Amino acid sequence: PLYSSAASDVYKRQVYDNIEKIKEKPDVIIDFSNPSATFNILKYAKENIIPIVIATTGFNDSETKIINEEYAKLIPIFKSNNMSYEISLMSEIISNLATKLKEADIEIIETHHRNKIDSPSGTALMLADSINETLGNKLEYVYDRHDKKNKRSNTEIGIHSVRGGTEVGKHSVIFFSEDESLEITHNVTSRRIFARGALKAVSYTHLRAHE
């Protein structure tokens, strides 16, 4: 079958409907799937000693623990909730801002297409974790306030999800201070950025595997 690369060039490649049918040994596996499929891929990677780049999101805490404590000790794993370089920069920026705006109320708003399954997005949680770790892991994550009957606490961080249309991905982190606010936003207009980021991760992971 034919399929297009991120650069819009067309290549002929064998496509398998089951990972167990693959005859060649890959140098690195890239996983853009869903948590239920990832563990079959991890099992295959472990059995064949193949490094893996995991770009899938939606893992719960126990699944993440299994990946980190069981599989990562046996094979090289590069795992990220977002393959965008600019999201990495955003994470650094908001962490720095959090140290300077310690009295600010922090809210995160993420927007994605109507077909996205997990909520909130893995990227939103990653951004929240960056801020929380910077502030000593003292923040409470609040995902919905419809049942809240009290004033906002200064030890919480709000995380909100919006779903609609074909929006690829938008993440905003807002710092609310007295009489002013500061908002940092990252907006994705093409999924090509994820492919480029994944290929950079492949290069890094492959080199690590051969150190």
Give a label for each model feature.
Residues 5-47:
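N-terminal glycine-/serine-/threonine-rich beta1-alpha1-beta2 phosphate-ribose binding loop
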Residues 16, 98-208:
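Active-site-lining helix/loop region of Rossmann-like oxidoreductase modules
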Residues 44-61:
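ADP-ribose/adenylate-binding Rossmann-like module
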Residues 57-76:
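Rossmann-fold NAD(P)-binding glycine/threonine-rich loop
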Residues 71, 78-113:
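Hydrophobic, well-structured mid-protein blocks that either form specific transmembrane helices
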